[in-house]
Amino acid sequence: MASIAHLVVSGLLAATAVNGQNYGGSGRSDDAFSYVQPRNTTILGQYGHSPAVLPSPNATGAGGWEEALAKAQQFVAQLTLEEKADMVTGQPGPCVGNIVAIPRLGFKGLCLQDGPLAIRVADYASVFSAGVTAASTWDKDILYERGVAMGEEFKGKGAHVALGPVAGPLGRSGYGGRNWEGFAADPYLTGVAMERTIQGYQDAGVQACAKHFIGNEQETQRNPNYNPNGTLTDVIQEAISSNIDDRTIHELYLWPFANAARAKVASVMCSYQRLNGSYACQNSKVLNGLLKEELGFQGYVQSDWGGTHSGVSSIEGGLDMNMPGGLGQYGQTPEAGSFFGKNVTFAVNNGTVDISRVDDMIVRIMTPYYWLGQDQGYPEIDPSSADLNTFSPRSTWLREFNLTGERSRDVRGDHGELIRRHGAEATILLKNENKALPLKAPKSIAVFGNDAGDTTEGAVNKATFEFGTLAAGGGSGTGRFTYLVTPLEALKARGKQDNTLVQWWLNNTLIADSDVTSLWVPTPPDACLVFLKTWAEEGSDREYLSVDWNGNEVVDSVASKCNNTIVVTHSSGINELPFANHPNVTAIVAAHYPGQESGNSIVDILYGDVNPSGKLPYTIAKNGSDYNAPPTTAVETTGADDWQAWFDEKLEIDYRYFDAHNISVLYEFGFGLSYTTFSLSDIKTEPLAESISSVPEQLPIQPGGNPALWESVYNVSVTVTNTGDVKGATVPQLYVTFPDSAPAGTPPKQLRGFDKVSLAPGESQTVGFELMRRDLSYWDVVSQEWLIPEGEFTIRVGFSSRDLSQETKITPVTA
């Protein structure tokens, strides 16, 4: 297996392989995801494959946290050993995660709340657009603005820590059940989104938590299986092991977490699965080596809920906070004990764990608390959270929580208008034949599909549902809607304004099985709008890439009788679109999960009040079988460690894979149409230093790693012109092709810059891109360093990964 050599050289893995996984084999199904692990797959056990990096580095306050660090150290100096154990161990309480108060020191505790698109356990809070939706804007300002607004709501409800944003999963597989919580199947775009979102959260005063670190790319077997007749630590089958080589982990999966560290993220959540054999929450190579040493991370590492599988090993491995604190599946049985808790005091007293390590754990927890001023006038926890918290209801509380804050306070402000605008800006126009869109006060429209109307399952999406529009996915990353504007509601309101006849049919089975001409009266409508949806949730991966609820058949039925069929998808991510070339399907719009203003956002696009400018954050293939790297869905052996996911595709995910193998696609990464047209011209480059070395200067590590990697080394500029007749926005995208001297396996091109610009008809604007050293570097597994290869780079700028009209060459490093 090719990847094993890189793992061995890097020190990420110390083992020899017999055989890895070949995703091209007969174990893969084309119509539903299925990858059955071959019997001769190399099995990595929990120990001996990922080298120890000990001790866990102490926080230094680097990056401007020195004053807060001093306050944290002073706080820790006043704690008893029992209080120190409390500070690193979660307790059931009013929030999803809770650190108890220490009244004698004036510390009111910490409240940690889900999630990446809303405060899940709260009333009178907004449901924002999902991560994949926000990424589809390709708008750095919107990403920041969304972060600020969400941070304001978390703080308003008394939550100290917002459990988001998400860079893991990155999107290795289109089947990933939680891809919608993250941003894009590209490390650069995800990195920018992470950085801007974190800055927004923390500028609003709430701690951000970057998750899930690292290699958490599938839901199937993400957790171990426990013996139902055994103890709460009696595991009969371990979680899957993500086996990733050194270069791949640096250039793909670690990349956006470097942006998070640079943004001074307060905390990082380690993931459920194993990494190269060892559980991610006790893997010292990953937590101590990559995160705390290489990236200079100054905050604290918290476990995913129930992701702690040891005490001393996890503490030494770099875990600082055990959430939610108990044993068993998802850590929900604190009454039975904890890997931390009293075991921390025992380990310190018997000399197994040095007290200095425990002190650093708490210093890391408290430093961002002081840095963000959460010790000064921070809002009290909203008591309604306790009433809504089904994860740890009051009956499970072991400690007392003094909830004196105002109940059910409304923190939404004017965020509804912001969510509406963000949803529209994220909407992607994939097809628009014969100027089907925008609609211009049509005389009649027909609305089809079970995604158009009101939900029938209530305000929280706990599981998939047949009837009702889909505006958020499921699991801990969902939200509780205080209201939801549906597409049908918004279309009827617009129809009333325009005196349009609006008819609707929401039963997909009826539509698919009927002659739709018998449904509408009296004549065919001017436009037929078909709303389709695709559910995804935490805890399970998608079974298909097609739309749900016979959506393809619904489109076929409508398009067979209506020559102006417009399809809108509300999806978690990638969909097969077999109807894309149907002559009667005149327009296709991808809206993803837009949040509570879903209907208003899509009507703004359909009627041209907002010109679509969203771009795909992934590739839509012609066929589902064209994708590589499906999740491992089954094993044929029964060993405790047998579940493995070998990332043999290495750097070839999404567009990198399609480019490397010259596979034609339906809609490429970065693609998206507009109601106007744009052109590019006059590409220019300018070096920012007289001499650029291959090896970066070795500077003292700061949050984000070696500061030299973040230094700009080249400027690239290009002129963008709106050549159409309406105002619109577009996203020039810069891709880099490395010289031939770069190591084998380097992708044909990689995104390294983008900017969204809005232009009036005929207006031109010069857009500049700053290329940092890291943008032109690869990770060298021998020297363990980022290197700029010698030779000529190709710089291309265009409007998608396969529409790159502007090209130039640069040679940063010569022999």
UniProtKB/Swiss-Prot annotation:
It is found in: Secreted. It catalyses: Hydrolysis of terminal, non-reducing beta-D-glucosyl residues with release of beta-D-glucose. One of its GO terms (cellular component) is extracellular space. Keywords: Carbohydrate metabolism, Cellulose degradation, Glycoprotein, Glycosidase, Hydrolase, Polysaccharide degradation, Secreted, Signal. Its EC number is 3.2.1.21. Pathway: Glycan metabolism; cellulose degradation. The active site is at residue 304. Belongs to the glycosyl hydrolase 3 family. Beta-glucosidases are one of a number of cellulolytic enzymes involved in the degradation of cellulosic biomass. Catalyzes the last step releasing glucose from the inhibitory cellobiose. This is Probable beta-glucosidase G. The gene is bglG.
